[in-house]
A protein has these predicted regions:
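Hydrophobic anchor at the beta1->P-loop junction of P-loop NTPases
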Residues: 5, 72-73
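P-loop (Walker A) phosphate-binding loop of NTP-binding proteins
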Residues: 8, 42, 114
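Conserved Walker
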Residues: 15, 82, 86
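Conserved NTP-binding/hydrolysis module of P-loop NTPases
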Residues: 38-56
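Canonical AAA+ ATPase core
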Residues: 49-54, 79-83, 91-175
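Conserved alpha-helical scaffold flanking the Walker A/P-loop in AAA+ ATPase domains
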Residues: 50-72
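Walker B catalytic acidic pair
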Residues: 74-75, 86
């Protein structure tokens, strides 16, 4: 289910979620939440496009990054409530409504949101309606000194991991 991951920067929260998407062979999109992010930056919007065949202009829907199986809402509390609300329908109903038209999101669909629990300056509290849509709250903490030494000894550089697909999106939906 949808999960809220709490942890300070540098704990590999993004890597964890991206790796999960790779193992499950699911489409992954990351959205960096900032104060100037707009709801349409998440859900998508209509744009004017020239039709080469007719020469006419028409409105065409351009899907936003929420159209993925696993969406990482990075630092979700850094954007105003109006923008945070763009995720509510997606998290609850696996669809988005734009300009009165409803678009289904791919299944399975999960939102993983990250939040820094220490740095509160320039943040907006998550409303209860949004917190209720998270099935899990995962707290990530610093490694112990021994664990850090083990990680450093095991890895000396950023590696390009090749994951074996454990299941497919269809397997998850069928379960």
């Amino acid at each position: 289910g949808n999960s809220l991951i709490l942890g300070v920067p540098g704990l590999a929260k993004t890597l964890l979620v991206h790796s999960l998407a790779q193992v499950l062979n699911l489409k992954f999109n990351r959205i960096q939440f900032t104060p100037d992010l707009m709801p349409s930056d998440i859900t998508g919007t209509d744009i004017i496009q020239d039709d080469a065949a007719t020469g006419q202009r028409r409105m065409v829907f351009m899907p936003g990054p929420v159209f993925a199986n696993i969406v990482l809402a990075d630092e979700v509390n850094r954007t105003p409530p109006k923008t945070q609300a763009a995720l509510l329908e997606a998290m609850q109903e696996h669809r988005v409504t734009i300009q009165g038209r409803t678009y289904q999101l791919p299944e399975p669909f999960f939102v993983f949101a990250t939040q820094n629990p220490i740095e509160l300056e320039g943040t907006y509290p998550l409303p209860e309606a949004q917190l209720d849509r998270f099935m899990f709250e995962i707290v990530m903490d610093y490694l112990t000194e021994e664990q850090e030494i083990e990680v450093v000894q095991a890895t000396t550089a950023i590696q390009n991991f090749q994951f074996r697909h454990a299941v497919t999106g269809a397997d998850i939906v069928a379960f």
